[in-house]
Regions:
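Conserved donor-binding/catalytic core segment of Leloir-type glycosyltransferases
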Residues: 5, 144, 187-208, 213-217, ...
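Nucleotide-sugar donor phosphate/pyrophosphate-binding loop at the beta->alpha transition
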Residues: 65-66, 106-107, 115-136, 174, ...
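Membrane-proximal helix-turn-helix segments that form the acceptor-binding/catalytic region
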Residues: 68-76, 93, 101, 110, ...
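Acidic anion/phosphate-binding donor-loop and adjacent secondary structure
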Residues: 121, 166-167, 171-194, 206-211
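A short, active-site helix/loop in glycosyltransferases that binds the activated sugar's phosphate group
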Residues: 134-178, 312-313
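Nucleotide-sugar-dependent
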Residues: 208, 255-293, 303-312
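Nucleotide-activated donor-binding/catalytic signature segment of Leloir-type glycosyltransferases, i.e.
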Residues: 230, 237-266
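A charged, aromatic-enriched C-terminal amphipathic alpha-helix characteristic of glycosyltransferases
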Residues: 325-332, 340-374
Length: 381
């Protein structure tokens, strides 16, 4: 059995948890070497590398060095691994430092799920961080990205020819218990609810998205209800609960377990917001969020801003709403249309139900193939 040392930025993060499950489901053994943003009890064997704070960049840099020392102190566990899998640039640096401290030559895979704002800066800071990424990327066995937008707009721009890339989208894991898909067609006998329920699910980290949804709640106090599922990034949305408390048709449900809670969440929604502007103009334009796959599996259509990789994905599959700027005026127009006529929602529900399941669910053995080919085994199919 192939053994993986997984260097993760937050042991409690839902995406980290999903990746571990996908490895284990594909027959790979995982030992975590992970930092944490909050206390948690991981489902896997884990070496705690210390606590970090969201947005505290200097503290995270210091923790990279401390974490590497802690990882190297568990040299026997680290040496048992056939492969190191490092998520995000800070953990990639931590992994290479740990290798140096422990005097190991274990191959490394770099997973980049976001292109951090520092990496796109044009000044000396940006050039320095890109130099670090380039040097570590060249020493990595492979690169894993969740969106082709990251390859086109970042890695090919700065590091063309210096890496071997795999696209691993943020799909549901094949072995996870996320329940059955809805019935094949939107059932005509079901009585349509009086309100359009619009959800925002996952990392709630975008002030503009929050403002747009609150504005929709104000514009349609009796016709629209906004549901928020997940944890807010306090550094990005400093005033959160007071805005929710001021609106009777905005409901915050807090954190959730993925995939266990997904079926109930998406069953309660008519549409899901899939926009992000936290890093507008670069990362937010290039990413493909979890919610388009989760919502797609449960036949809940997404709404995305035009000109983004998410919008292109929805248009390619013909399964969601794309809204042009200015969103402050165009998004309310769409919602007003859906309030008065739900047929477009029904049409996209039926399209989503008709799409192949593997658009939303990662096939069994997919991550095993990525690992095998990275280590020089058979070609992936």
């Amino acid at each position: 059995m192939t053994r993986i040392a997984f260097f993760g930025h937050d042991a409690a993060d839902a995406a980290v948890r999903r990746r571990v499950k996908s490895f284990v489901g594909d027959g790979l053994e995982v030992t975590g070497f992970m930092m944490r943003r909050r206390d948690s009890d991981p489902d896997w064997e884990n070496v705690d590398l210390g606590k970090t704070r969201d947005g505290a960049f200097l503290q995270r840099i210091a923790q990279v060095f401390k974490g590497a020392r802690k990882a190297a102190a568990h040299r026997e566990k680290l040496a048992d691994a056939d492969l190191i899998y490092a998520r995000n640039l800070d953990m990639l640096a931590c992994a290479f430092l740990a290798k140096r401290y422990a005097k190991l030559d274990t191959p490394v895979i770099y997973e980049s799920l976001d292109v951090h704002r520092l990496l796109v800066r044009k000044d000396i800071v940006g050039r320095t961080v890109r130099f670090l990424e380039r040097s570590l990327l060249k020493r990595s066995r492979a690169l894993v990205v969740s969106s082709p937008g990251f390859i086109k707009n970042h890695f090919e721009r700065y590091y063309a020819g210096q890496y071997k890339a795999y696209l691993v989208e943020n799909r549901l894991s094949a072995d996870a218990d996320f329940g059955p898909r809805p019935c094949g067609d939107a059932c005509s006998e079901t009585v349509a609810p009086k309100k359009v329920i619009l959800g925002w699910v996952g990392n709630l980290r975008c002030q503009r998205s929050f403002n747009l949804l609150c504005a929709l709640a104000d514009a349609f106090p009796h016709a629209v209800e906004v549901h928020l599922h997940g944890l807010p990034a306090r550094t990005e949305i400093p005033v959160f609960e007071p805005e929710i408390d001021a609106r009777q048709n905005v409901r915050y449900f807090g954190s959730y377990q993925s995939p266990e809670d997904l079926s109930g969440i998406y069953a309660s929604l008519d549409v899901v917001w899939a926009g992000d502007f936290m890093e507008a103009g670069y990362n937010s334009v290039w990413l493909l969020p979890n919610r388009i796959y989760e919502g797609g599996y449960y036949a809940t259509p997404s709404i995305a801003p035009a000109g983004t990789e998410t919008a292109a994905w929805l248009q390619r599959h013909g399964c969601g709403f794309v809204v042009e700027e200015p969103l402050e005026t165009e998004l309310p127009k769409l919602i007003e249309k859906l309030v008065s006529d739900r047929s477009e929602i029904t049409r996209y529900v039926n399209v989503l139900n008709a799409l192949p399941e593997d658009i939303f669910v990662q096939p069994a053995g997919f991550m095993r193939d990525v690992v095998r080919t990275s280590l020089g085994g058979e070609s992936a199919t």
